Amino acid sequence: NWISPEEIELVEGKKVLKSNNSIEVKVGPIESMSKSKKNTIDPEKIINNYGADAVRLFILSDSPPEKDIQWSEEGIASSSKFIQKLWTLHSKILDAVDKNYNKDSGENLVKFTHKFLKKITDNLNNFSYNVIIASIHEMYSFFSKEIENEYTSDTLKENYTKILISIMPVIPHFANECLNLLNIKKNIKWPEYNVALLEENFVNIVVQ
């Protein structure tokens, strides 16, 4: 017989029935969700616990769309923690926008933004959502370091806004709230990347 996870508890390192601790439960391999197997998930409960964006982020990041995902509440919790990191980063960016530094031309930021936009646009068209999630992690790492460079307010706000718009299909609630906090509420259009800014500038140095 199939047993619901809610009917099981851990006692002295063993998984047993809550109703009768003398009966040990055998855990089988991962199965597809089915009411008869009592392994379905209540989406409302998960969304209430972690938020819709975290659930969406987990589902899209787990595997390519043509493959089945392996449901994991630990995975959703990890996605939720990452979104919290994005919120912390957003607060730092808002603070930098308000202070309006003027020490960096923003060349690295502009180039990164347009490369990011190309990645997101191309992978949305290819339904490669897991690649998009990886790009969002790269964006987080980039901004976490670059925020110290003290860009001008306009440069930082303009490029960060483009990035927020581009990630709306993946984490819409987060992106929309961030745009509202930046007072961007009208005429939101999909950002286009500049091909000229995708090129890397290399200098050949003769070694003697």
Task: Specify the residue positions occupied by each region the protein language model found.
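Conserved phosphate-binding loops in nucleotide/dinucleotide-binding enzymes
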Residues: 2-52, 66-77, 196
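Helix-rich, typically C-terminal accessory recognition domains appended to large enzymatic cores
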Residues: 43-208
